[in-house]
């Protein structure tokens, strides 16, 4: 298939010999690739260095998603100004990367008591059991789920949120790219790769771990301090309220 396309050049954001050989067999003459056989690299740093070398200019790792302004404004008009609006990222690529749903429910209840809020549950159809737990809880009437929405339909909603709180998942990175302040819980994935590339992301790590030691196979979900998550959430919401006040 690649050979039929008659590509002139390929950029391979990977150190795999397999991709190099596939490109050669496809007849692609110009092959730009990471150094072969490189292991344990930081995927963000490696991509940045590679891209800068290819383009000959400095590039930012700060992703930015642009949305239709009218759609964002329409959603904003539906948001109550008396509430804080929080995107809650309960989903993840696997159970070891998810904080307990009971913790999230407890967190929502405590936040809402201190700062009246509405929660937007960033999860999909595969997270139905987790979503059901939330909608069986005391906080259910303050929640809206994304499970029946397409990702592009959720973005104007997220864009109007005051804060993202949740696991290291796709919703985190979408929220960050929409310039939303994010509180990300890292328990079984590399902080230095996924939590340091954006000014919008603040992290909570398992007790006893550091940014260097929190990586794949850390298995630290049970060591995420509830009080730290709660206190940091309140702090970020209060800071946001203060900044909005002085800006107005």
Regions found by a protein language model. Name each.
Residues 1-248:
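Catalytic machinery of carbohydrate-active enzymes
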């Amino acid at each position: 298939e690649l050979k039929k396309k008659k590509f002139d050049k390929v950029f391979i954001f990977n150190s795999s010999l397999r991709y190099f050989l596939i490109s050669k067999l496809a007849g692609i003459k110009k092959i730009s690739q990471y150094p072969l056989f490189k292991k344990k690299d930081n995927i963000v740093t490696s991509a940045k260095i590679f891209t800068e070398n290819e383009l000959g200019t400095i590039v930012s790792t700060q992703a930015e998603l642009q949305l239709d302004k009218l759609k964002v404004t329409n959603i904003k008009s539906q948001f109550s100004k008396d509430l804080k609006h929080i995107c809650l990222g309960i989903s993840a690529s696997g159970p070891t990367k998810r904080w307990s749903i009971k913790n999230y429910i407890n967190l929502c209840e405590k936040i809402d008591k201190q700062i009246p809020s509405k929660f937007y549950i960033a999860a999909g159809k595969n997270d139905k059991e987790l979503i059901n737990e939330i909608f069986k809880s005391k906080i259910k009437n303050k929640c809206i789920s994304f499970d029946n929405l397409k990702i592009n339909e959720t973005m104007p909603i997220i864009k109007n949120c005051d804060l993202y709180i949740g696991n290291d998942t796709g919703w985190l990175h979408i929220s960050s790219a929409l310039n939303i302040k994010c509180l990300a819980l890292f328990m079984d994935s590399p902080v230095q790769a996924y939590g340091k590339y954006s000014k919008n992301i603040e992290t909570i790590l398992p007790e006893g771990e550091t940014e260097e030691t929190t990586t794949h196979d850390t298995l630290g979900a049970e060591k995420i301090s509830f009080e730290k998550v709660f206190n940091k959430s309140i702090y970020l919401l209060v800071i946001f309220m203060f900044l909005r006040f002085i800006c107005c």
